[in-house]
Amino acid sequence: LLHRKIMYEMYTVLSLNSEAVFSLKDGINFKKSPDDGKCYIIYKENGELKACKNQCKHQGGLFIKDIEDLDGRTVRCTKHYWKLNVSTMQYVNPPDSFTQDELDEGGLQLVEVIVWDPWLADPQDPQELQEGEVTVTYLTHACMELQLGGKKMIFDPWLTGPAFARGWWLLHEPPADSMERLCMADLIYISHMHSDHLSYPTLKSLSATRPDVPIYVGDTSRPVFWMLEKSQVQLTNINIVPFGIWQNIDEHLRFMILKDEVHPEMDTCIIVEYKGHMILNTVDCTRPNYGRLPHNVDLMMSDFAGGASGFPMTFSGGKYTESWKADFIKNERKKLMNYKAQLVKSLQPKIYCPFAGYFVEAHPSDRYIKETNTKNNAEQLNALIKKSAPGITTWTPKPGAVLDLALALMSPSRKAITDPPSGTNIYKDSWDFDLYVDELNRAITAEIFKHKSWIQFYYIWAGFKNYDLVVRVIETDEDFIPIDNGYNYLVDFMDLSFPTQRPTREHPYEEIKNRIGVMRHVVKNGLLWDNLYIGFQNRLSREPDVYHHQFWNHFQTELPVTGPDWDLFLQQVPSHQRSAEPQGIQTESGSASTLS
């Protein structure tokens, strides 16, 4: 028997009779529950059993037998090819990443502890809604305005400027009054710290008018607003709320924030309830609330597009040919499309809306990324959902379009959606590139980069070490061509040293070419490297072709929340080094100069 335990109760999720148990072969056994179709892996060795969910902890992919495994202990994820040694429950590619959650063994009973359904606390019976009482207006990307009786709530306001340094730009033109709507909001929910959801250019405009608007975020391990002080944006009413607890706004309106299982340090989602009617927004969560979500909500919205990563577009060497990239991207988008359709079908919301995927690599220097990084089409996803679950109403939003929830619930055939007037500009055609790129490039001439010892100071601050990886970082121009006199250096993270040549020992190696303006902006301000990687601002090659989860996870999510003390650094620079030095340093062999 496989059991699940909710709080202190258990229920059977998979039952194996004695014949089925006897027939388990040594090694890996794949099993599916006939009741709910959920999959499990049972590993048998010397008569002992181990079991886990057949679901990769990276992004939820399904495991299959690894044809390269000669010992019969390893399975491979069909999504990103991560590998799990089921005998140890350790991921072996990438190494040192996750530990798979093992189902506890007790004789032939295997038990899993799972999270309960917190939205069931203090249940509310749905009340009849009047026309116009609850409306949902799509503004752009992940930004929605909810009119909930007398209250206005806004999700993830990104209304101006780029995201991820200069890599992402808004695809849709927000309605002309979007900023005014934001300033009139009664409350704002920001799901996580990524800059397509937490947009400091947008919040800077908001703070000039409404610095005290209530903003709600989840209590993530890395604070959502960890960069607030450095941003110099003045917001005075940020509320960090615990997960899984109803937050009451008035007698009819409440909301609950839930965290993601895969990225609990930052990703969250939200349930909004008004007069017993639920709206579920899973945002970018890979596995929100451990996969347990409310069924039959009135409205569900989620991401859908894919393409929110530099992989594989920014990689070169080995298998990374253009044809391989195209095939990989096509397959990934198809898998994501099918996953979203299946998720929506399983949850059976009355209405579903795909959003949070309307971005474009608009800057001319990123034309290659724009052409290569194809994304899912919202209308195609909705068509797939309608085919498999015809009872679900779908909505493909346009900027300024309004969904009236009461009308939609009364009859899907009624005119519940009001689209923007004919002739409205749907797609952006101007982004003020120079304004934002020039701001990033101002870091190039910062005083700290006149002294090559900034490299050692920065990586000691970053705090990543005792990991067998050697990285070469190269500063480049817009086209990723190394800059004459630009910095080109090695970091050996095994002992956090800065050699002039690669070590003689056998070692994993990664070469990262970064646009100089973005890299120096990131270094100067102590920002996370998602600006480089998710923002398509670098180009990468690696030997061997292994994803180093610990390295990238550290630099994308675990850097210190307090930035480098560059004032202290400049005070420590010897006086004879304070005269102007080259902006970078490069040896004839391409190796970095020795740091002292």
Predicted regions and their residues:
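Pre-active-site segment of Zn-dependent metallo-hydrolases
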Residues: 27, 31-35, 40-69, 122-129, ...
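Feature captures hydrophobic
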Residues: 403-596
